[in-house]
């Protein structure tokens, strides 16, 4: 059913509807072009007919799912867009919006929810924290022996180019599992006055003022 829901969603459309296009489409494996070991395994393609087939095989067409999101406008819009597309595949799904205090108290316990993640410098950092069996923030409860073994191998490979070869297999494993729908990478912005240099926005919103300087 996870794979069916994933196949029902057009990530490019969700980026436009949920975030007004302010970002880049993602490919359902939580590793992106900002990571040195990112492997381009191709875009995610929506396949409504295959989604319907998987739903029929699972016999879950009459079950109603609940998609939970926090009460923040862009996250609500994103979850609404995802739910609408999943309904087009024939699944029943209702939306629940919770205030931030309630949502974040139980964010890792919801069966089906939308969560935002800040960036990490390395793809392996994200995967080890979020998808390895028994990991602290493994909200999806993903547990896959092949994935864990590949991730351990990647974590033990310091060279990014060599790690990329392993990462291609990891990304494919994660996407094929249907464990997440990741529609986009959200753009982050920073404003500064003319003459300020070295003040680029960090993906994790870190402040590195030791790199900032002023033109004379």
Label the model's feature ranges.
Residues 7, 24-57, 74-77:
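Structural transition elements
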Residues 3, 7, 12, 16, ...:
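Solvent-exposed, polar/charged alpha-helical surfaces in well-ordered, non-transmembrane soluble domains
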Residues 82-85, 89-92, 108-117:
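Alpha-to-beta junction loops
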Residues 13-18, 56, 101-132, 174:
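Pocket-flanking alpha-helical
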Residues 1-34, 77-78, 174-182:
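Periplasmic-binding protein-like
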Residues 3, 92-103, 126-194, 216:
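Extracytoplasmic/peripheral linker and loop segments enriched in polar/acidic and small residues
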């Amino acid at each position: 059913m996870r794979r069916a829901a994933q196949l029902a969603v057009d990530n490019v459309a969700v980026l436009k509807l949920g975030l007004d296009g302010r970002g880049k489409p993602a490919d359902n494996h939580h590793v992106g072009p900002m990571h040195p070991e990112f492997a381009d395994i191709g875009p995610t393609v929506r396949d409504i007919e295959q989604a319907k087939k998987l739903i029929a095989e699972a016999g879950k067409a009459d079950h109603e799912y609940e998609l939970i999101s926090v009460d923040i406008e862009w996250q609500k819009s994103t979850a609404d867009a995802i739910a609408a597309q999943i309904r087009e595949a024939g699944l029943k799904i209702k939306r629940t919006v919770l205030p931030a205090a309630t949502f974040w108290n139980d964010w890792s316990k919801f069966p089906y929810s939308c969560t935002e993640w800040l960036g990490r410098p390395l793809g392996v950092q994200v995967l080890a924290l979020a998808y390895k069996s028994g990991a602290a923030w493994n909200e999806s409860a993903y547990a896959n022996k092949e994935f864990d073994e590949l991730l351990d191998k990647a974590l033990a490979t310091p060279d990014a180019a060599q790690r990329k070869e392993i990462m291609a297999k990891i990304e494919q494993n994660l996407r094929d599992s249907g464990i997440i729908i990741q529609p986009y990478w959200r753009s982050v912005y920073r404003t500064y006055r003319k003459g300020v240099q070295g003040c680029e926005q960090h993906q994790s919103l870190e402040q590195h003022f030791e790199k900032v300087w002023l033109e004379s």
